[in-house]
């Protein structure tokens, strides 16, 4: 089972395309939708939905995957639910760059302070990070610097922020999922 979390643009047709691409790894791909506008509510909702899926799951190596803001959530929810994560261009600093787009961007900073202390150290090697060198929305170098000490970083030379085509990375994702 692969759980897919969309980014801020929840209505993007690219979400469906990514789900279809992920089905080459596992036919059971589940998209979990969330508001993107209310961080504390989103966290509760995502934890509840992912936990529900894991309770009914027969796959002993589930994976959670997210793009952009979905990558922010996939890393955290995956850690809290003890499943491996794959994140594409994760938005690591939504409290800085979501101003004017969501109701309370400061809630992201609050979530960070209330999260498990040093969670990335405890999550070491359980997240695969795929970053675009041509991310027009986020500073991918800053993301790499924050995540490199804990996770493997894969650089993509073609894609933009929304990562429309993930197919060049499917074999690596499949191998990462298999490690369970």
Curated annotation (Swiss-Prot):
Signal peptide: none annotated. It comes from the Bacteria. It holds the Pfam family UPF0227. InterPro entries: AB_hydrolase_fold, UPF0227, UPF0227/Esterase_YqiA. Belongs to the UPF0227 family. This is UPF0227 protein YcfP. It comes from Salmonella arizonae (strain ATCC BAA-731 / CDC346-86 / RSK2980). The lineage of its organism: Bacteria, Pseudomonadati, Pseudomonadota, Gammaproteobacteria, Enterobacterales.
């Amino acid at each position: 089972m692969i759980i897919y979390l969309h980014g801020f643009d929840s209505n993007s047709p690219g979400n469906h395309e990514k789900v279809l691409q992920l089905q080459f790894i596992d036919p059971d791909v589940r998209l979990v939708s969330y508001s993107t506008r209310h961080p504390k509510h989103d966290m509760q909702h995502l934890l509840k939905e992912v936990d529900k899926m894991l309770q009914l799951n027969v796959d002993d190596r589930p994976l959670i995957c997210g793009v952009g803001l979905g990558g922010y959530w996939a890393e955290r929810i995956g850690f809290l639910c003890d499943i491996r994560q794959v994140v594409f261009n994760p938005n690591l600093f939504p409290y800085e760059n979501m101003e004017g787009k969501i109701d309370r961007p400061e809630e992201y900073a609050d979530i960070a302070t209330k999260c498990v202390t040093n969670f990335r150290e405890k999550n070491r090697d359980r997240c695969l990070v795929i970053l675009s060198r041509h991310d027009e929305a986020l500073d991918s170098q800053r993301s790499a610097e924050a995540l490199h000490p804990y996770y493997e970083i894969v650089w993509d030379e073609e894609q933009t922020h929304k990562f429309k085509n993930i197919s060049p990375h499917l074999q690596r994702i499949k191998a990462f999922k298999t490690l369970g």
